[in-house]
Amino acid sequence: MITRMNVVQRGPMTLDEFLAWERRQELRYEFDGFEPIAMTGGTLNHSAIATDLVSALRGRLRPGCRVYRSDVKILVAGRVRYPDAAVTCSPVDGQSDILPNPVVVFEVLSASTASVDRVTKNAEYAATPSIQRNVMLEQVRIGATVFARDGANWVGTVLLDDAVLVMPEIGIELPLRDLYAGIELPPPETDD
């Protein structure tokens, strides 16, 4: 096995081959449809935002829905992803390692993965019928980019500062600032 950055080179795999292979690994891997990609660690802010998100969701979700952290995989467009959090409102098999029918997925953006999260994963989430909303949370400022279904369209909106994240599919309205309480953000860039 040859590794290149965070990509394990094994040759093209099928989804079933990947799932069988990954269950035997100590580390977590995403699957891009061809090969395993090792999951990397995050910053303290990334972890704090994701933790605050899960805590905020858990106490507000409508009955029948449950939030899961980043150690549970989802299947999207023939690929395997580990979002930072995901909500399902469907019954689950507690022994499974695959979350069925995610309704809302959340990614905390990192410098090293933001382009994949914004483009590749967003397209995969849009192609997954159960996913109604993809929330991408910033790590360097209070902000989110939200894509949601509007009929046949996948429509993006940017939320900043005092905005409220409205997610009717899971019965939640969440002030964005709640996810950043106590988190030290870098100073805003100036146009000097």
For each feature predicted by the language model, list its residue ranges:
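Gly/Pro/Ser/Thr-rich low-complexity, intrinsically disordered segments predominantly at protein N-termini
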Residues: 1-192
